[in-house]
Curated annotation (Swiss-Prot):
Protein name listed in UniProt: Uncharacterized protein MT0028
InterPro entries: DUF4226
Family note: To M.tuberculosis Rv0026 and Rv0739.
Length: 120
C-alpha cells in the first residue's frame, strides 16, 4: 500500500510541476503580450500625432497660397516641393507603421504558440 501511495504522490508532484511550468509559461506570455500591445498602441498614437501635424501644416498652407505666390513659376515650384516633402513624410509614417505591424504580428504569432503548446 505504501508503494502505491508513494507512486500516487510522485504522480501528483509531477502533475503539479507540469501545471506550474504551464502557469509560468502563460504568465510570461501574458507579460509579453501586454508589452506588445502597449508598444503597438504607443506607436499608433505617435503615427496619428505625426499625421495630424502634417495635416495641420497642409491646412495652413492651402489658404496661404496667395502669400506663397503660387501663381508664379518660382512660387508654384516651391509649393510643389513643399507638397512633395509632406507626401514623403506621410509615406514614411505609413511605411513605419507597416513595418511595426509585421514585427508585432510575428511576435503575436509566436505568442499564440505559447498559449496553445502544452508545457513540458
Amino acid at each position: 500500500m505504501s508503494e502505491q501511495a508513494g507512486s500516487s504522490v510522485a504522480v501528483i508532484q509531477e502533475r503539479q510541476a507540469l501545471l506550474a511550468r504551464q502557469h509560468d509559461a502563460v504568465a510570461e506570455a501574458d507579460r509579453e503580450l501586454a508589452d506588445v500591445l502597449a508598444s503597438a498602441h504607443a506607436a499608433m498614437r505617435e503615427s496619428v500625432r505625426r499625421l495630424d501635424a502634417i495635416a495641420a501644416e497642409l491646412d495652413r498652407a492651402v489658404p496661404d497660397q496667395d502669400q506663397l505666390a503660387v501663381d508664379t513659376p518660382m512660387g508654384a515650384r516651391e509649393f510643389q516641393t513643399f507638397l512633395v516633402a509632406k507626401q514623403r513624410e506621410i509615406v514614411a509614417v505609413v511605411a513605419a507603421a507597416h513595418e511595426l505591424d509585421r514585427a508585432k504580428s510575428a511576435v503575436l504569432k509566436r505568442l499564440r504558440a505559447q498559449y496553445t503548446e502544452p508545457a513540458r
